[in-house]
């Protein structure tokens, strides 16, 4: 939610915040309106509301999913929530936006936060739009509500574009259609559909499009100008740059940006309308098409394209100011626009006519795009239901929103996609026509608005030129924003996932650079693909669309491949290649200028048309129609040839251009051209577009050439961003691109390793470009894959193409949509997550990264598949190898072997030569080692998802995809390392085998990871952390990708190491992604506490977008499974296949695996060292073999170990595994394990995100290798193992086959779970990779038993993994206090449940993580109390996660220490469960099982070790690894395999159990763990005294203990040997006991203790309620164990033998005076009065006197009152009063209160023991504490308002008289219904009043005292009611108790005597004042004693 907030803030920045400000009323206003609208539109909120809901659902899909479903309640509820959360977030984040003077941002912002932007937006859409007039609505809503509307759309887009939006589009399509019909009655029915979508996305847009096109344009301009107006917001826009940027753009380019975001998301999958929106967004760079963008954005395309165009163009429209701001805004917008674009795409898909109209209205270009969008839109309407359903289902998941968007895009598009293949985006409905039309439209638009429509090219150019050149400072200020805008546009139109990835990538690495690289990449791609410039750009921008259809392939490829196509094929190829290569090489600034210059300049025509007019036409027509053919061919050629060329020119150019981008491009060598590219694409794209064009450009650069786009982009980014994004570009792009694009670009840059000096740039640009690259790459790859698949260019990467195409063609309708849905959802989720987290983390960075992650991931998925390997290969230098995978995905399978070996070899050089560039080394290694990895590295976020999806769809591709998924996950993790939270989260989903999950993972990875890492990488990453983070993250990620990819590939191929790393990488990247998810859910948890609750819900919604995707992805998965069940098994088991390959290769290439492990470990170790992949690569190469390998295996260890144990148990892997285990713990203990978390965390801890980033940056690689090694071990190992095993079932040994069988179950689940695992991994990585490791472990277990979904879901909420995950988490919640999660879960549970089943693994991993997180958060206190099994499981988790939490908290404390810990804790426990499941599941792969066990053990140990600290944590982590290493490795792989076999068998059961019961999370999975957990508990309890890690191990053992005899023994052995190693390793890092204890304390120490001695060891404050006849319920607050004991004694003795309060002075005889009884609080009374003390007339907490105690009624009167537990109610009332008066209380001194409480406890005599006193004390504790009465406890609420007549008068007179803020307090004295006979007293007043005693709950003497007091006039205040008289005889001074204190009377507490100032003892006089105060204190105590 923070991401939401921040995203909201960003979005809200422009439009949402003012709307937020105005929106609060407006939202409230909207509430009814939205209620109306929602009611009217059935949840669409009338489109406006629906959009709001959609946006809000998108954004708050997790939280708002259910609300989204009922938009009315959701929006209204969310309006309140938005108002709170959204307004909160927006207010907090968007105060500048409000300052910026855009009311829209607030609204958007409101819609942004939860569904915050939804309601305003929805309201804006429906009612506000309606009320404001549709045109006016668009304008007004653009202006006023448009921001919200945009935010809705944007947030919907960015957050869960598909989620809420799709939910709305599901219901809202109808509702929105209703609303839009209402609006569209003004517009058209076609527009209605589109407007439905658009209204959903940009309800105001459709109308303005029809009625208010100009108005919409004005609105857009208005918002655009708003962004201009938002210079202050520009800073905010930087944050917004993450998400708010397009929201800011939404403010100025509200509709365009905001709407485009949803539309982009919708369009992303839809057609590249959204992509064009992205293209427009990219063109947003060239947003010279500002009016185009506005018109574009205003129209339906304005919905998606306007956002894009408007985003980008609008950003361009205000070329200098506005554009920069718009771009800034629009960058976030693109981020959100991605979701929005999805929505827009959906809108487009839904409203193709509207799009046409919109486009027509908006601009020719817009209409063209609109038509394209419309063409898609028509398909979208057809797919709309699917989209909506998928979206709707995932709408619960924010992810589903994006996924849905993608799903619709993919789903609908894939139908069209399958129909058109190319028109995924372009031709979702109209593949060739749509694509072409869009392309043509865009081209015409480009032509008509060359400067505007150069948007694709000029968009890139304009965006770059505008944003970067035109508004270079703004661009630079908001590189992420403009990049986000451009990137977002691109990314949004890239599959949303790609967009998310791209945005995440672009944004996180560099808000601007990221965005720019994304835009640039897309633009450069588009630009490079001039024809693909408009459409390709849109497609480029819509990797989703690109991914979504063959056209998607074309589109996706349009970005990456289209650049390649343009570059490598026909004009597109030539242009792109020239542009790409030239630009990349910077050799062709003319072409670069043509492409980039148009991009840069407002010569879209020049660049678009000049650079790609022919290419555009060719590519457009080609890619529109021929795109599939030509593009495929072009893709193949472009990608292959271009990849080859790019590899060459990319290797050279990229080497030089990456060098150039890093060096030359960074310098403004291609400043103009490259600046454009740099601005738009180069920021994310120099790495992602430029770098993606260069790296991803190499990925895309195969298409893009990464050169024209990439190099150009990169160059542009480099040059333009040279100054500002040079670090960004290189770090961002390199970071992201390094991850994804940097896998391509940075790896290219790594190719020019010296350019990894770009390492800094890479760090920034890697993230950035990688995000962009991811975006591009994924779509490029996806596009390529899809297109290649459609057009057999899939031969280029048969698997990629096959995967993507298999998905595209086989499942394009469903699978492709699923992929895209998953991507879109991921994009949305990731975008949301990214936005949320990106915003949170680095608002611009996060969002864009997330989006980039999402977008780039999908794009990367496709681009990665083909492009990436090539680009990666480029970096890897075996371009042919990389090219091979790119060349053929099938080959990619082989390539995994071929490329992996090559990569490994290259990786060796990469590791060494790139060693200095941690990122490059890793990426290079990854690329080199794994072209697949390269792809994967770029793919990680998007590719994984797409790959996963494609994987799912195409067995070959699946395997490859999974590999890529893994690699992508790895890379995403690396990217995610950049932006852990989102990135990893998204990457979790992206990395998830499941397309949706994978996409989401990628999104998460890119978003959160990149976002987080990017900030960190940007900051520390760029500095040292950037290199470290980047090197670590990017490199790690790349390395992981390499390893993962290499692991399978290299395993297949020469590399045992890559093999080793590959599984690890895949799982690790998943874990990292999940960790990132969880961390973005660190961020996600902090950030996504809201966001994590929402964003994580979204992020985990990504897996659950994977759930949506699940829906889709389920469909896809299942469809893929059915269609390509083998493929699905491969896909789902692609990780398993990869793992199998890895294992296969591991045994075959065990030495190489070892080598790879060495290499991988080296990077990992380097990462461990803070640059696991950095320079230490070489350093740790040898140690890394052990430690990095261990770390790898530790993080990735279980997966890798599982895999490697599978064949390293067979071979070296086990030693590697052991090493990895040990190293993982070592990493954990040392920098590696925990260093990734801690090192990354600590090194990146400077960066709040850095920590998460660092945890994820380092962890993605290291934790990925290490913590993921634990989580990844678990999850990835078993899951990836299973997947890989499954993928490589044939090559895998029989046990692997056995696992494969399980993989079929588990892989489906595993795949589903894997996303969630990856989500968990992301969450975990984000939080702590360890947690994710655990999560992954849990996920494997959950794989089988939904444990995964639960933890994952838990992770989701806690970690912002995903609402769906959250939802899943809820059931497994185990009373974690995951109320929000529960709520969100309930809201999103249906979809999530469904998704849980389908994506149970996907969601499961996240769930586990969330559970872990939440368990950690709330679980430790709660969990212990929770079910024993749960507690046990959570104990294990707690212990494990405690370590993780300790470490994560220590390290990832920044963003998600708690969530991380919770997640980690949960992940730990769940991981254990997962480990059980995984170990069991991995039983086939005993090694994985062992790995799982090791991981689980490792996690318990390592987690606990980690909590010790990086070192301590590492040691335990290593220890768990050691556990496995010792038990498994040391004991023997044999024992481990045996245990694993048992585990596997158990896991087999577990997978089925866990997999099938989505909610079985722990019931089945955790029951496994639990029943085992019970034993584990026992063991834990037994072993708990030793180290909690052991208990976690025990749980593991227990988990594994299903085959408990051996497993438990082994685990015990592991635990014990593990404990020994753990101790030993912990000793390495920290003594295990220490980690455990901190762990226990930190994580859930009490949970395990809770079972046995939780209360003894872990004390939870609680309220002790005793029912007493007279007193009613006596509630005692026990805040401390001492209190508990004392109160137990008191309660027993004191309550029973309550002596009169005046025990000191009076006898124990009951007073003869009448008594009062405490009665029920009067809630309804004709008498209203102030609640004041009846004795002193002062209110509660007056002068810190504490709470008022009461109400006391005369005994006669009390008898007439109903007998309730008055004490409790009164306590509540008191609490209320206390709360009310807390602020009023002058000095709430907690210390005093504590002292008083202590004194009270000391001095509490019988009174203290008295229940009433206790109640008073409790209320005082509760209320008094806050008030912190000076005499805190003396306050009794005894003021009888009615009976003490003077009370009211006293109150009023005394209030004024009280100098201590009496008047203030008086003002705050609540007017409450008071009974005339009720008395409230301060404790002090009663204590000090004569003759008042509290005996047995009866207050004696109060009436008499009151009667007397009424006659007594206070000498101090002259008011009646004095109760204290001077002790001196004859002295007539009488005081109220407070007055006595004020009068400096000496209050002697021993006998409660008062001495007036005159009669104070001379000496005591000084003392008495002191004593007065002391006496006050002691008096308070005494008084409290007296009661």
UniProtKB/Swiss-Prot annotation:
Coiled coil: none annotated. A zinc finger (PHD-type) spans 1912-1960. Pfam families: zf-HC5HC2H. PROSITE patterns: EPHD. A zinc finger (C2HC pre-PHD-type) spans 1856-1892. Residues 1-22, 121-142, 206-235, 289-311, 357-377, 417-432, 526-537, 566-576, 585-605, 618-627, 666-682, 722-731, 1481-1501, 1850-1859, 1971-1987 have a biased composition (Polar residues). Changing residue 1939 to A: Reduces the inhibitory effect of the atypical PHD domain. Gene3D superfamilies: Zinc/RING finger domain, C3HC4 (zinc finger). Residues 1565-1579 bind DNA. Keywords: Acetylation, Activator, DNA-binding, Isopeptide bond, Metal-binding, Methylation, Nucleus, Phosphoprotein, Transcription, Transcription regulation, Ubl conjugation, Zinc, Zinc-finger. The modification N6-acetyllysine is found at residue 631. InterPro entries: EPHD, TCF-20_ePHD, Trans_Reg/Chrom_Remod, Znf_PHD, Znf_RING/FYVE/PHD. It is found in: Nucleus. GO terms for molecular function: DNA-binding transcription factor activity; transcription cis-regulatory region binding; transcription coactivator activity; zinc ion binding. Changing residue 1702 to S: Loss of interaction with RNF4. Residues 645-657, 761-777, 974-989, 1158-1170, 1305-1321, 1332-1346, 1463-1479 have a biased composition (Basic and acidic residues). GO terms for biological process: positive regulation of transcription by RNA polymerase II. Residues 1606-1627 have a biased composition (Basic residues). Homodimer. Interacts with RNF4 and JUN. Binds to the regulatory region of MMP3. The atypical PHD domain functions as a negative modulator of cofactor binding. Transcriptional activator that binds to the regulatory region of MMP3 and thereby controls stromelysin expression. It stimulates the activity of various transcriptional activators such as JUN, SP1, PAX6 and ETS1, suggesting a function as a coactivator. This is Transcription factor 20. It comes from Mus musculus (Mouse). The lineage of its organism: Eukaryota, Metazoa, Chordata, Craniata, Vertebrata.
């Amino acid at each position: 939610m923070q991401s939401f907030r921040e995203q909201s803030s960003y979005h809200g920045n422009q439009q949402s915040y003012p709307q937020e400000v105005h929106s609060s009323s407006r939202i409230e206003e909207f509430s009814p309106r939205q209620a109306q609208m929602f009611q009217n539109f059935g949840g669409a909120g009338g489109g406006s509301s629906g959009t709001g809901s959609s946006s809000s659902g998108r954004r708050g899909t997790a939280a708002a999913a259910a609300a989204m479903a009922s938009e009315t309640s959701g929006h209204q509820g969310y309006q309140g929530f938005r108002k709170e959360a959204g307004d909160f977030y927006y207010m907090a984040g968007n105060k500048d936006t409000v300052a910026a003077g855009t009311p829209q941002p607030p609204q958007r912002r409101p819609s942004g936060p939860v569904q915050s932007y939804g309601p305003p937006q929805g309201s804006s859409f429906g009612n506000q739009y309606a009320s404001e007039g549709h045109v006016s609505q668009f304008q007004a809503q653009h202006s006023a509500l448009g921001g919200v509307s945009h935010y809705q759309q944007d947030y919907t887009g960015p957050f869960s574009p598909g989620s809420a939006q799709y939910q709305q589009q599901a219901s809202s399509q109808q509702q929105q259609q209703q609303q839009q019909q209402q609006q569209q009655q003004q517009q058209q029915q076609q527009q209605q559909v589109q407007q439905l979508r658009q209204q959903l996305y940009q309800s105001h847009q459709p109308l303005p499009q029809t009625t208010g096109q100009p108005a919409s344009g004005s609105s857009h301009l208005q918002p655009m100008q708003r962004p201009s107006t938002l210079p202050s917001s520009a800073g905010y826009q930087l944050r917004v740059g993450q998400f708010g940027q397009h929201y800011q753009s939404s403010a100025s380019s509200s509709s365009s940006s905001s709407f485009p975001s949803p539309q982009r998301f919708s369009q992303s999958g839809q057609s590249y309308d959204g992509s064009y929106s992205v293209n427009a967004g990219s063109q947003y760079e060239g947003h010279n098409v500002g009016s185009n963008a506005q018109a574009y954005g205003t129209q339906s395309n304005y919905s998606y394209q306007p956002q894009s165009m408007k985003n980008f163009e609008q950003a361009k429209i205000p070329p200098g100011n506005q554009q920069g701001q718009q771009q800034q805004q629009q960058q976030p917008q693109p981020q959100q626009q991605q979701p929005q674009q999805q929505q827009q795409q959906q809108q487009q898909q839904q409203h193709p006519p509207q799009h046409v109209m919109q486009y027509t209205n908006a601009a020719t270009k817009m209409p063209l795009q609109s038509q394209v969008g419309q063409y898609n839109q028509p398909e979208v309407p057809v797919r709309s239901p699917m989209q909506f359903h998928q979206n709707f289902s995932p709408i619960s998941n924010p992810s589903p929103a994006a996924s849905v968007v993608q799903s619709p895009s993919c789903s609908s598009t894939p139908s069209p996609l399958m129909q058109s293949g190319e028109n995924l985006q372009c031709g979702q409905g109209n593949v060739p026509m749509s694509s072409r039309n869009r392309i043509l439209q865009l081209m015409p638009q480009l032509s008509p608005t060359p400067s505007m429509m150069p948007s694709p090219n000029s968009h890139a150019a304009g965006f770059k030129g505008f944003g970067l050149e035109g508004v270079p400072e703004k661009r630079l200020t908001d590189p992420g924003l403009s990049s986000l805008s451009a990137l977002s546009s691109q990314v949004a139109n890239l599959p949303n996932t790609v967009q998310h990835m791209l945005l995440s990538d672009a944004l996180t690495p560099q808000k601007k650079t990221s965005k720019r690289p994304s835009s640039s990449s897309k633009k450069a791609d588009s630009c490079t693909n001039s024809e693909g410039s408009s459409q390709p750009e849109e497609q480029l921008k819509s990797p989703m669309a690109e991914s979504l259809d063959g056209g998607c392939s074309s589109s996706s490829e349009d970005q990456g491949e289209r650049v390649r196509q343009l570059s490598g094929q026909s004009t597109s190829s030539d242009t792109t290649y020239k542009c790409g290569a030239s630009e990349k090489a910077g050799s062709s600034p003319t072409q670069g200028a043509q492409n980039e210059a148009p991009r840069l300049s407002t010569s879209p025509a020049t660049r678009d048309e000049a650079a790609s007019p022919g290419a555009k036409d060719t590519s457009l027509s080609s890619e529109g129609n021929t795109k599939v053919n030509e593009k495929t061919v072009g893709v193949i050629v472009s990608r292959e040839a271009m990849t080859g060329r790019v590899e060459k020119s990319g290797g050279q150019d990229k080497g030089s251009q990456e060098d150039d981008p890093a060096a030359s491009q960074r310098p403004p060598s291609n400043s103009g051209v490259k600046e454009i590219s740099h601005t738009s694409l180069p920021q994310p794209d120099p790495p992602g577009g430029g770098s993606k064009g260069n790296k991803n450009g190499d990925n895309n650069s195969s298409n893009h050439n990464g050169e024209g786009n990439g190099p150009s982009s990169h160059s542009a980014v480099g040059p333009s961003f040279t100054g500002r994004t040079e670090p960004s570009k290189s770090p961002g792009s390199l970071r992201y691109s390094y991850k994804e694009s940097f896998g391509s670009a940075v790896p290219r840059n790594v190719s020019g390793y010296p350019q990894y000096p770009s390492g800094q740039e890479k760090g920034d640009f890697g993230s950035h470009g990688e995000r962009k690259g991811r975006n591009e790459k994924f779509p490029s790859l996806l596009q390529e894959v899809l297109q290649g698949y459609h057009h057999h260019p899939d031969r280029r990467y048969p698997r990629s193409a096959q995967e993507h195409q298999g998905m595209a063609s086989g499942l394009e309708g469903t699978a492709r949509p699923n992929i895209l849905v998953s991507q879109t959802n991921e994009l949305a989720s990731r975008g949301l997550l990214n936005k949320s987290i990106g915003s949170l983390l680095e608002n611009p960075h996060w969002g864009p990264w997330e989006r980039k992650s999402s977008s780039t991931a999908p794009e990367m998925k496709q681009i990665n598949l083909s492009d990436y390997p090539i680009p990666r290969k480029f970096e890897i230098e075996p371009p042919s190898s990389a090219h091979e995978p790119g060349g053929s995905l099938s080959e990619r399978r082989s390539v995994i072997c071929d490329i992996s070996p090559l990569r490994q070899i290259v990786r060796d050089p990469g590791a060494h030569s790139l060693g200095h560039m941690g990122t490059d080394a890793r990426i290079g290694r990854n690329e080199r080692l794994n072209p697949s990895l390269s792809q994967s590295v770029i793919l990680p976020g998007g590719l994984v998802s797409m790959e996963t999806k494609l994987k799912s769809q195409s067995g070959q591709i699946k395997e490859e995809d999974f590999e890529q998924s893994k690699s992508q996950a790895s890379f995403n993790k690396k990217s995610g390392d950049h932006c852990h939270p989102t990135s990893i989260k998204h990457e979790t989903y992206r990395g998830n085998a499941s397309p949706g999950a994978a996409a989401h993972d990628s999104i998460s990875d890119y978003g959160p990871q990149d976002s987080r890492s990017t900030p960190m990488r940007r900051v520390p990453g760029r500095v040292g952390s950037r290199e470290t983070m980047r090197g670590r993250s990017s490199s790690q990620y790349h390395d992981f990708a390499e390893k993962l990819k290499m692991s399978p590939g290299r395993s297949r191929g020469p590399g045992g190491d890559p093999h080793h790393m590959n599984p690890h990488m895949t799982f690790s990247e998943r874990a990292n992604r999940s960790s990132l998810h969880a961390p973005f859910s660190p961020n996600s948890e902090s950030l996504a506490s809201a966001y994590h609750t929402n964003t994580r819900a979204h992020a985990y919604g990504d897996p659950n977008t994977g759930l949506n995707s699940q829906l889709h992805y389920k469909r896809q998965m299942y469809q893929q499974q059915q269609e390509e069940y083998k493929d699905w098994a491969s896909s789902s088991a692609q990780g398993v296949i990869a793992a199998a390959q890895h294992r296969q290769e591991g045994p075959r290439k065990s030495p190489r695996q070892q080598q790879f492990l060495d290499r991988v470990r080296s990077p990992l170790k380097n990462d461990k060292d803070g640059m696991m992949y950095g320079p230490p690569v070489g350093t740790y190469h040898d140690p890394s073999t052990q430690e990095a390998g261990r770390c790898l295996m530790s993080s990735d260890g279980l997966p890798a170990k599982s895999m490697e144990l599978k064949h390293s148990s067979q071979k070296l892997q086990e030693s590697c595994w052991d090493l990895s285990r040990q190293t993982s713990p070592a990493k954990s203990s040392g920098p590696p394990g925990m260093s990734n978390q801690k090192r990354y965390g600590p090194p990146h801890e400077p960066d709040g995100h850095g920590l998460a980033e660092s945890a994820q940056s380092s962890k993605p690689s290291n934790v990925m290798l290490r913590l993921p090694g634990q989580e990844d071990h678990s999850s990835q190992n078993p899951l990836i193992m299973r997947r890989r095993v499954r993928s490589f079932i044939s090559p895998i040994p029989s046990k692997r086959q056995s696992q494969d069988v399980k993989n079929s179950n588990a892989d489906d689940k595993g795949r589903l779970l894997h996303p969630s695992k990856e989500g968990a991994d992301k969450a975990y990585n984000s939080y702590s990779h360890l947690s994710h490791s655990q999560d992954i472990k849990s996920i494997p277990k959950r794989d089988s038993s939904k444990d995964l979904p639960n933890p994952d879901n838990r992770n989701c909420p806690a970690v912002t993994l995903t609402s769906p995950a959250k939802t899943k988490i809820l059931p497994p919640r185990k009373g974690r206090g995951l109320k929000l999660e529960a709520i969100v879960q309930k809201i999103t549970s249906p979809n999530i449940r469904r998704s849980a089943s389908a994506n149970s693994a996907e969601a499961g991993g996240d769930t586990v993580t969330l559970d872990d997180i939440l368990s950690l958060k709330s679980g430790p206190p709660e969990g212990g109390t929770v079910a024993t099994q749960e507690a046990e499981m959570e104990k294990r988790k707690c212990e494990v996660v405690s370590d993780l939490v300790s470490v994560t908290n220590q390290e990832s404390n920044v963003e998600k220490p708690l969530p991380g810990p919770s997640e980690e804790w949960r992940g730990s426990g769940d991981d254990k469960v997962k480990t059980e499941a995984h170990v069991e599941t991995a039983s086939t792969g005993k090694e994985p099982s062992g790995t799982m066990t090791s991981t689980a053990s490792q996690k318990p140990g390592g987690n606990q070790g980690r909590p010790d600290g990086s070192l301590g944590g590492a040691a335990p982590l290593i220890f768990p690894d050691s556990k496995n290493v010792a038990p498994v490795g040391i004991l023997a792989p044999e024992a481990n395999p045996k245990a694993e076999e048992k585990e596997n068998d158990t896991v087999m059961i577990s997978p089925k159990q866990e997999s099938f019961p989505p909610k079985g999370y722990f019931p089945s999975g955790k029951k496994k763990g639990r029943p085992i957990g019970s034993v584990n508990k026992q063991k834990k309890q037994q072993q708990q005294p030793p180290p909690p890690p052991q208990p976690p191990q025990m749980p593991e053992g227990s988990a594994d203990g299903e085959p408990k005899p051996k497993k438990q023994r082994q685990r015990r052995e592991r635990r014990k040997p593990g404990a020994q190693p753990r101790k030993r390793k912990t000793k390495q890092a920290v003594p295990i006991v220490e980690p455990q204890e901190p762990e226990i304390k930190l994580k859930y120490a009490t949970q395990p203790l809770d079972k046995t001695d939780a209360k003894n060891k872990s004390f939870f404050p609680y309220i002790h309620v005793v029912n007493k006849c007279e007193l009613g319920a006596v509630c005692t607050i026990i805040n401390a164990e001492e209190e508990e004991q004392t109160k137990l004694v008191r309660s027993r003795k004191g309550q029973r033998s309550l002596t009169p309060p005046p025990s000191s002075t009076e006898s124990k005889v009951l007073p003869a005076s009448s008594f009062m009884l405490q009665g029920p609080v009067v809630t309804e009374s004709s008498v209203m009065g102030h609640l004041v003390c009846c004795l002193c007339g002062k209110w509660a907490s007056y002068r810190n006197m504490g709470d008022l105690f009461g109400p006391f009624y005369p005994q006669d009167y009390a008898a007439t009152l109903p007998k309730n537990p008055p004490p409790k109610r009164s306590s509540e009332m008191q609490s209320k009063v206390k709360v009310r008066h807390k602020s009023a209380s002058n000095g709430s001194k907690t210390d005093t209160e504590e002292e008083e409480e202590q004194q009270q406890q000391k001095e509490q005599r019988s009174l203290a023991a008295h229940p009433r006193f206790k109640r008073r004390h409790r209320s005082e504790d509760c209320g008094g504490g806050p008030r912190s009465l000076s005499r805190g406890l003396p306050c009794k609420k005894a003021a009888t308002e009615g009976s003490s007549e003077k009370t009211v008068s006293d109150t009023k007179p005394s209030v004024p008289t009280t100098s201590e803020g009496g008047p203030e307090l008086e003002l705050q004295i609540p007017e409450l219904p008071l009974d005339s006979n009720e008395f409230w007293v301060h404790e002090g007043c009663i204590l000090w009043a004569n003759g008042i005693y509290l005996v047995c709950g009866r207050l004696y003497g109060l009436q008499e005292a009151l009667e007397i007091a009424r006659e007594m006039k206070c000498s101090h205040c002259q008011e009646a009611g004095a109760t204290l008289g001077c002790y001196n005889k004859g002295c007539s001074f009488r005081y109220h108790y407070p007055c006595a204190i004020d009068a400096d009377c000496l209050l002697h507490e021993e006998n409660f005597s008062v001495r007036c100032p005159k009669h104070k003892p001379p000496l005591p006089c000084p003392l008495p004042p002191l004593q007065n105060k002391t006496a006050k204190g002691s008096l308070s105590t005494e008084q409290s004693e007296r009661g």
